[in-house]
Amino acid sequence: MNHIRNFSIIAHIDHGKSTLADRIIQRCGGLADREMEAQVLDSMDIEKERGITIKAQTAALQYKARDGKVYNLNLIDTPGHVDFSYEVSRSLSACEGALLVVDASQGVEAQTVANCYTALDLGVEVLPVLNKMDLPQADPDTAKAEIEDVIGIDASEAIAISAKTGMGIDDVLEQIVAKVPAPRGQSEAPLRAMIIDSWFDSYVGVVMLVRVVDGRLQKGERFKMMASGAAYEANNLGVFTPAQQSRDALEAGEVGYIIAGIKELKAAKVGDTITLEKKLPNNLGPATEALPGFKEIQPQVFAGLYPTEANQYDALRDALEKLQLNDASLHFEPEVSQALGFGFRCGFLGLLHMEIVQERLEREFDQDLITTAPSVVYEVVKGDGEVIMVENPSKMPDQGKIQEIREPIVTVHLYMPQDYVGPVMTLANQKRGVQMNMQYHGRQVMLTYELPLGEIVLDFFDKLKSVSRGYASMDYEFKEYRPSDVVKVDILLNGEKVDALSIIVHRSQSQYRGRAVAAKMREIISRQMFDVAIQAAIGANIIARETIKALRKNVLAKCYGGDITRKRKLLEKQKAGKKRMKQIGSVEVPQEAFLAILQVED
């Protein structure tokens, strides 16, 4: 046990985390040279393309240190994005050490800081590493100062490396051996293992990635999940060196996989504790208490996904079910919209998660989708005191029946160079933000705001990047539900509500947003044979109106001269025809209209 080192790598997107992992695996001979490919641990195409890691992966490596001993290094690759923060915290709690990789040419970024604090809270030893030292613009001294200022850990011994050229990799491995503590666990205690991650393999079922904390699990033993109580038999265990290697047992302190013929991912929840099912003569029986930190993940952002062709509904459901096999945090339920037909209401962890799910549906399953505006969950207290959760604007009860609406508030940390503080503060105030704190760290500034999640969901991130020329970064965490004066704005076409176009906004912005959406619709919906009235309404109050004028034929073209009554007769006849058409005609709402709501400028 003293020769095991479990560590992970914390880094911002594109600071070289996966490249460093590749180098470490290569140095320890985890894969033959012919199997080495760039970003070995990122197995999904979309992970490689976006340069992000979504699912955790591991590699168990043997390293012969300078002191002549052989150490088992377990590298646990973590996702780096704030949407996947729960998965990050589980990956980190399975480690005793973490390499904090900072791009020497860019300095510290928000996501890194958030994950680094998570690591420090969990008592993980953090070793700073400066990457990209081969670049001419690398500035190690500033980067070290930033690490000390922003994160508050000693960076004087930060290791200078270049993952691309392979410089300094041995120093990193030596530091891991020297500074990362060995796992603390009792091999003679009842089995307790934590699920770090789980994914679905179409051949063997669910594969669980676990960190054994106490005791041991042998092949063929029956174990149970402490959160759900379900029991299974361990058909196959082993470790990844990234390639799969079977073993007969997993011991305390090790990180490996268990395959137990589980059919669905919901059964193997990330963060759950595994223990033995019952006491037998040759084992120590089940543990009494679970490992701390397990929680059910709640989706924060909802959107409707509809197939463009009605006959693609079943295909979309199959695609979502397949995605859910590998993504337990994706929720969906069937939904019917008058405007868009049959589809699904999907729940996501955040905006990146939503984009990735959409992109995977389009890319891996060839789906053509219509996506409605993302919305958040509101707590609504009805007149009779009943509290309901509303995740879809069209489900919001009538104004008269509502006592109060509470919206989700999040704490947002914004990091940026000090030149951009002004514009960023203006943006946060526009979004109804309340400033809580402001700290200067050298040239970097950290602003802390409380903002309604509903304001962040639409376009806050894009705006933040544009006002700060891409330098600002953010992370957020849910704080509480708070009473707020929000209203539902409906869009009516010729007096008919279009449910998929409803939005929930703060009353102070409702007039403006209603007008903007109506104006946008007027540009998008094509002219019909009759007048189309586009109205925005709150309850029964119309707050904005635009009219799309009818196309009309010049019925007077064939009258030369002649009496006015003759012309009037023809015009009246045309008018009556248009009126009749308006009663029976319906307006086609093009696909762009649903997306236009997202782009209404504030």
From Swiss-Prot:
Residues annotated as transmembrane: none
State the reactions this protein catalyses: GTP + H2O = GDP + phosphate + H(+)
Q: Supply one GO BP term.
A: positive regulation of translation
Highest taxon of source: Bacteria
Stored Gene3D superfamilies: 3.30.70.240, Elongation factor 4, C-terminal domain, Elongation Factor G (Translational Gtpase), domain 3, P-loop containing nucleotide triphosphate hydrolases, Translation factors
Pfam families recorded for this chain? EFG_C, GTP_EFTU, GTP_EFTU_D2, LepA_C
Q: Provide the GO MF annotations for this entry.
A: GTP binding; GTPase activity; guanosine tetraphosphate binding; ribosome binding; translation elongation factor activity
Check the record and name the SMART domains matching this protein: EFG_C (SM00838)
Q: How would you describe this protein's topology in the membrane?
A: Peripheral membrane protein
* Record keywords: Cell inner membrane, Cell membrane, GTP-binding, Hydrolase, Membrane, Nucleotide-binding, Protein biosynthesis
Q: What does this protein do?
A: Required for accurate and efficient protein synthesis under certain stress conditions. May act as a fidelity factor of the translation reaction, by catalyzing a one-codon backward translocation of tRNAs on improperly translocated ribosomes. Back-translocation proceeds from a post-translocation (POST) complex to a pre-translocation (PRE) complex, thus giving elongation factor G a second chance to translocate the tRNAs correctly. Binds to ribosomes in a GTP-dependent manner.
Q: According to its UniProt record, which protein family does this protein belong to?
A: Belongs to the TRAFAC class translation factor GTPase superfamily. Classic translation factor GTPase family. LepA subfamily.
- Protein name, entry field: Elongation factor 4
Record the organism: Acidovorax sp. (strain JS42)
Which gene is transcribed and translated to give this protein?
lepA
